[in-house]
Amino acid sequence: MIFPKSEYKILELIYENPGIRLSELIKKAKVSVATAKQRLEHLLSSEIIAEKRIFGGKRTLIRNFFPNLRSEEGKNVFSLIESEKKQNFFRKNKNLIGPFRQLLKNIDNGIKAVLIFGSFATQSQTKESDLDILFLFTKKIDIEQLKKEVERSFITFNQEVSPRVESLNNFKKNINKGIYETIIKNHIIIKGALDYIKIIESFD
């Protein structure tokens, strides 16, 4: 972890809850007001996060914090957070390391990002849960071939694997709707963290 524990928690909360209020951030991060303000000022001055203030007269009534995905610093930091999430996922699901390694080795290079979503992403899976995988592509790919590769790669995995294949453009168009909102909120990026950050950049 490249940040102090309290700062990392603040970053994670802002990334997963864009627009989070200062009071909620302090409560969920379990830090003092002084610590939170110190960490936030550092992250703001580094252009890693951004804020919006609501004023009442000359007083600041509400402070909302967002990941700053328009800055290089923000992109790099939040892609590292995605990488950390992936490492934590594989520490808890060692039986998926091999299948994903084989899958990534053999899939079309037109696939820019691979994400886990659903119960496995929230660590709420049971023995009956499907492993939901989203593939985002930028150019035409052979979807049937991809599904066969998924079957081959996960042949030793004892649970159902449910691949979902989307074009990057379609994902962007629907990013604020239904299942897409859920995927944005809870996911593990297996491939293409920086590409994914760039995808959602215009929605920060």
Where are the regions a protein language model picked out?
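Catalytic core of pol beta-like nucleotidyltransferases
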Residues: 1-110, 122-128, 138-204
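Short helix-loop-helix/strand-helix junction enriched in hydrophobic and basic residues
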Residues: 112-120
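Acidic Asp/Glu-based divalent-cation binding sites
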Residues: 130-132
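Short hydrophobic/aromatic beta-strand micro-patches
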Residues: 134-136
